[in-house]
Amino acid sequence: SAASDVYKRQALTRSDFSLAQSVVADDVLLDAAQRELEERAILTIAKRQPMAQDLREIVGSIRIASDLERIGDLGKNIAKRVMAVHEFGQPVQLTRGIEHMAELALDQLKDVLDSYATRDTDRAEAVRARDEDIDAMYTSIFRELLTYMMEDPRNISACTHLLFSAKNIERIGDHATNIAETIYYIKTGQQIEDERPKGDRTTSMVLPVNAATDK
């Protein structure tokens, strides 16, 4: 899928400027596809007045398309930050964790899209459970980058972009989890009852002043 292709690209860890530009350009395709799907879904509801399973399929497809479109937006934001970080350069050790986190998010996204294709609720629930791993990794990366900024204020600008890139990857995992929950709803007609785990522990941590605002 176009969304999956966006996250196969490791523009951040490779500091690949041209690849980052390509990711930004590809977001337009995702936006257009999402709009087209939504228009078709609304037209189908108006003309055929589907019920039960058929209606859930249509409503679910709208939800999933919205999550994929948002994932595209997050990918575009990461790509723009690659362009900014490219000017500063970044230590390899800081990007390895982010690269691994991105691989986890990509695997999560691939698995949830596969489970949508097969309507496999067990696989969708497994994807949902794995979101904790991405949350835990994000918290670890946050601490590492925060320490790096405190040790040398000259690192603040580059590390801020890396921080927000990591947060965007964590949010991609959240959207994959949303898709998993939608798949469960499509197949069963019920919402998953247990509360989603919340693994982000960074809200109690304090950023350096210059790094506190997203751009």
Regions found by a protein language model. Give the residues of each.
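Leucine-rich amphipathic alpha-helices with coiled-coil/heptad-repeat character
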Residues: 37, 41-44, 48, 82, ...
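Amphipathic alpha-helix face/heptad-repeat signature
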Residues: 19, 23-26, 33, 57, ...
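Hydrophobic/aromatic-rich structural module bridging two neighboring secondary-structure elements via a short loop
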Residues: 39-66
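Heptad-repeat coiled-coil/leucine-zipper interface motif in alpha-helices
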Residues: 15, 26, 33, 37-40, ...
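Divalent-cation-assisted or electrostatically stabilized phosphate/pyrophosphate-binding catalytic cores
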Residues: 49-50, 55-59, 89-110, 117, ...
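Acidic (E/D-rich), amphipathic helical modules within compact regulatory domains
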Residues: 11-32, 47, 80-84, 104, ...
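A structural feature that tracks compact, well-ordered secondary-structure segments
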Residues: 8-9, 65-86, 112-116, 124-128, ...
